[in-house]
């Protein structure tokens, strides 16, 4: 009997655990020179010894506490200037195993070790924060006097269109359609957003631009007056008949070049950010710095600025333009009106910015990064569009984002730098470039396959992945390992956004796009119960749960442009809103345990 009582339990590998949260690494985000306490968990009285192993030492850890059937071991190390990598060695009788980011393994693989990047910290407010993404033109029209009017200008093959019916489904080629959503509309709905439980508002681009998506920036220094305030207008200047010459678009030119309109729009934005901050909320802007638009004052392909006082000639217009080196031109003999510039993915409406050729451009965009996170706007961070594409080489790209981080953090140390990125982001998440990413690989994609069997654009259905827990867990673990814990806790975890089909639409397992399936197919046979299941996971998963406007109200839609339908004011699914509200208020917001393992 005494022999049986003295028997040790079977070695429990499932009880072995550690990670990079503040429960197992104190402080969780150390600086060079800090002494760090690293902890490891085992089942109580279940192992002989635990060692903390790094490049430089192998330290035997000591039991520092026992709780709920677990022993906790700890050891202290001092962090230098370089990356500190470590793993654990566990001994039980004749058994030796190892533990790192891969979990328990019988053979140590160094590439999966835990890593500490000295000085890499992400804003505490962003860890686990509930975010809400707004595509401004489709949220709420708060000021009809600033609406784009039909025929105001010509863009990609046709004239601008003012949509009169708020609930109209966007056209397949709807980039030039405008519903009138604006900053005042957001201001009018701050009570709703705060009551919902939103902590951070993320706005798709708001700077001057001819499209409704505004990823083709025309002027980085000003909010588009169509989103802001128009105090000086032109009663004439609408393009008539076959006229597609934007140098005749006097109404548009007046609205977007008159400094009174531009400054009034910036002032309104400053009021919006002040009110958001007064409520204890944050705001993030969308930064599109890889490319601009052909309407941009630096290029001026539409000759909007050519004869406007106070604006130098654009690079398209003149070889002597001060902005010539902001772009790469393939034919030096094609001026005036040189169309031979490089476009991003060969799009002539999206000129690629030539940072390597212009230090002036390089410094200008760094100043733009600083401007909007500083007074009077005090924006709380940037979401960076196609961030890995900026520049013409990998080395240059990394150097730019290092300088961008220094500039932004110098202006606002608590600003977040969050990048759009598909694929492994490890190279940018070392503490000196991006803080985190939009979490496609380690959240949106695996979750949508698991719960719906659908690809995130609704372009493919795979029954073998629907409900496949092994594939889901494997994908999540694999891709989460690419994110440093500080990045994982702030990663933007979305179910839907402006580039992918609405999650609720994916629940109908219908492969399609609006161009051939039609808009009705996006809402046929959807399953709100699966949507609620997804929201529950979203609100409890490590990271920053981010709601795409209208998802909480039951909005459907195939991939863009159908995913950019207007918010269904007066037609909301109130049960879905209430479900989101409960999840957001009682599961996600601060004081949420964002650091939970």
Predicted regions and their residues:
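Active-site-proximal helices and loops of the catalytic beta/alpha 8
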Residues: 273, 277-281, 290-291, 295-314, ...
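Substrate-binding/active-site clefts of carbohydrate-active enzymes
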Residues: 136-199, 206-376, 404, 410, ...
């Amino acid at each position: 009997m005494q022999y049986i009582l003295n028997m040790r339990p079977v070695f429990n590998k499932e009880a072995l655990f550690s990670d990079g949260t503040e429960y197992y690494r104190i402080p969780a985000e150390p600086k060079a020179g800090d002494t760090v306490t690293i902890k490891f968990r085992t089942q109580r009285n279940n192992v002989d010894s635990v060692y903390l192993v790094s490049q430089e030492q192998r330290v035997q850890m000591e039991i520092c506490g026992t709780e709920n059937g677990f022993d906790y071991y700890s050891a202290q190390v001092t962090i230098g200037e370089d990356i500190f990598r470590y793993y654990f060695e566990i001994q039980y009788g004749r058994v030796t195993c190892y533990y790192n980011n891969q979990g328990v393994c019988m053979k140590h693989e160094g590439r999966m070790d835990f890593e500490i990047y000295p000085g890499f910290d992400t804003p505490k407010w962003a860890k686990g924060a509930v975010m809400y993404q707004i595509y401004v033109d489709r949220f709420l029209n708060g000021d009809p006097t600033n609406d784009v009017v039909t025929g105001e200008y010509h863009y990609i093959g046709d004239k601008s269109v003012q949509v009169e019916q708020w609930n109209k489904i966007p056209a397949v080629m709807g980039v030039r359609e405008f519903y009138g959503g604006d900053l005042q509309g957001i201001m009018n709905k701050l009570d709703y957003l705060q009551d919902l439980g939103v902590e951070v508002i993320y706005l798709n681009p708001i700077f001057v631009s001819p499209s409704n998506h505004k990823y083709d920036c025309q002027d980085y220094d000003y909010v588009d007056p169509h989103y802001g305030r128009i105090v000086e207008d032109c009663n004439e200047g609408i393009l008539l008949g076959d006229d597609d010459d934007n140098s005749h678009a006097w109404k548009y030119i007046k609205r977007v070049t008159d400094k009174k309109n531009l400054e009034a729009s910036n002032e309104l934005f400053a009021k919006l950010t002040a009110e958001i901050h007064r409520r204890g909320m944050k705001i993030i802007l969308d930064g599109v710095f890889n490319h601009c638009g052909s309407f941009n004052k630096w290029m001026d392909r539409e000759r909007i600025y050519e004869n406007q006082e106070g604006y130098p000639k654009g690079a398209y217009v003149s070889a002597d333009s001060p902005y010539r080196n902001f772009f790469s031109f393939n034919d030096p003999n094609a001026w005036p009106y040189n169309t031979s510039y490089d476009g991003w993915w060969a799009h002539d409406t999206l000129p690629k910015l030539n940072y390597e050729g212009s230090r002036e451009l390089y410094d200008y965009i760094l100043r733009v990064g600083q401007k909007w996170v500083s007074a009077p706007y005090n924006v709380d961070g940037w979401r960076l569009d196609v961030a890995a594409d900026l520049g013409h080489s990998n080395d240059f790209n990394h150097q730019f984002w290092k300088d961008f981080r220094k500039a932004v953090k110098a202006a606002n140390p608590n600003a977040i730098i969050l990048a759009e990125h598909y694929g492994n982001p490890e190279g940018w998440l070392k503490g000196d470039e991006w803080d985190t990413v939009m979490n496609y690989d380690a959240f949106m994609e695996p979750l949508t396959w698991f719960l719906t069997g659908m690809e995130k654009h609704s372009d493919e259905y795979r029954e073998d992945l629907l409900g496949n827990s092994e594939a889901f867990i494997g994908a999540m673990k694999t891709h989460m390992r690419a994110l440093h814990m500080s990045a994982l806790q702030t990663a933007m975890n979305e179910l839907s956004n402006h580039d992918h089909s609405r999650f609720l639409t994916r629940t109908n397992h219908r492969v399609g796009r609006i161009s051939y399936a039609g808009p009705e197919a996006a809402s046929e046979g959807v399953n709100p119960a699966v949507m609620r299941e997804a929201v529950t996971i979203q609100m409890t998963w490590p990271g920053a749960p981010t709601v795409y406007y209208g998802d909480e109200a039951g909005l459907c839609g195939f991939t863009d442009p159908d995913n950019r339908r207007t918010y269904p004011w007066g037609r909301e699914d109130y049960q879905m809103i209430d479900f989101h509200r409960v999840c957001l208020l009682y599961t996600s917001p601060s004081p949420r345990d964002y650091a939970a393992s």
